[in-house]
């Protein structure tokens, strides 16, 4: 696992976008694993800008999102399909038929199996983008999720439900279930990039990077991946014991390669 400490949330997003663009320049038909939530929004804004400047194309790209609420139709304003259309897809040249998000209105077991098959048929995911929950969840893999789990239905924790309640009005019934890629599915990606910003994520970042690998902290499974990149801002990195070492590695990488990444 490689840790990059950025000066600000904006720098986290910019560095993350640069990784995506380098991949697409090397492999225009890459398969991207995408995430929702507040952290990726700034990343997607950078990708949109770079697309508008003609630096990158998504015309051959295929995408697979991590998760979707069960019981919410794609056209619902709080569905992750709606989120992705608003925050990314409507502003780039990706083909609609190449964007994949679990169907929250289908049979969860059948949909989960079909989603795994679609990923396999696409040749697997080249770069999986992740955010990080305050309790260490990635996707909707809550604490105690199996580290070898595949795409399936999951019951959300009360903490996750509270965290997401701000997106739903008082008269809306908030989903308590979701279809999510499993941790094993995520670890199958050839590269993984996790972004986190803010002091509220500091405990989760420390447990992910420096804690034991444990189902109680699902993101800690990334320690087992041969090509996992963690990009965090100074607040999210504030509780890392080896923060000086991570900064030293950054400076040495810059000295030798001429760039952090």
From Swiss-Prot:
Known pathway: Amino-sugar metabolism; N-acetylneuraminate degradation; D-fructose 6-phosphate from N-acetylneuraminate: step 5/5
Enzyme Commission (EC) number: 3.5.99.6
Hydrolase as UniProt keyword: yes
UniProt keyword annotation of Flavoprotein present: no
GO biological-process terms attached to the record: carbohydrate metabolic process; glucosamine catabolic process; N-acetylglucosamine catabolic process; N-acetylneuraminate catabolic process
GO cellular component: cytoplasm
One Pfam family linked to the record: Glucosamine_iso
Organism superkingdom: Bacteria
Keywords: Carbohydrate metabolism, Hydrolase
Active site: 67, 135, 137, 142
Function: Catalyzes the reversible isomerization-deamination of glucosamine 6-phosphate (GlcN6P) to form fructose 6-phosphate (Fru6P) and ammonium ion.
Subunit structure: Homohexamer.
Protein name: Glucosamine-6-phosphate deaminase
Organism: Hahella chejuensis (strain KCTC 2396)
């Amino acid at each position: 696992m490689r840790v990059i400490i950025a000066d600000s949330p904006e720098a986290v997003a910019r560095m993350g976008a640069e990784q995506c663009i380098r991949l697409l320049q090397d492999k225009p038909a890459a398969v991207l694993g995408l995430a929702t939530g507040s952290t990726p929004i700034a990343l997607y804004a950078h990708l949109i800008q770079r697309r508008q400047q003609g630096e990158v194309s998504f015309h051959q790209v295929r995408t697979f999102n991590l998760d979707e609420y069960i019981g919410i139709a794609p056209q619902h304003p709080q569905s992750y399909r709606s989120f992705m259309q608003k925050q990314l897809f409507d502003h780039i040249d990706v083909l609609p038929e190449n964007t994949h998000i679990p169907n929250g209105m289908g049979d969860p077991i059948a949909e989960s199996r079909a989603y795994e098959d679609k990923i396999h048929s696409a040749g697997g995911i080249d770069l999986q983008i992740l955010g990080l929950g305050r309790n260490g969840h990635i996707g909707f893999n809550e604490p105690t999720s199996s580290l070898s789990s595949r795409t399936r239905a999951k019951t959300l924790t009360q903490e996750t439900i509270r965290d997401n309640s701000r997106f739903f009005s008082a008269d809306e019934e908030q989903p308590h279930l979701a279809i999510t890629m499993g941790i094993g599915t995520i670890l199958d990606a050839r590269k993984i990039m996790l972004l986190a910003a803010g002091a509220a994520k500091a405990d989760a970042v420390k447990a992910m990077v420096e804690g034991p690998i444990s189902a109680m902290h699902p993101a800690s499974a990334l320690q087992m991946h041969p090509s996992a990149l963690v990009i965090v801002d100074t607040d999210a990195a504030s509780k890392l014991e080896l923060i000086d070492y991570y900064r030293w590695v950054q400076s040495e990488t810059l000295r030798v390669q001429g760039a952090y990444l």
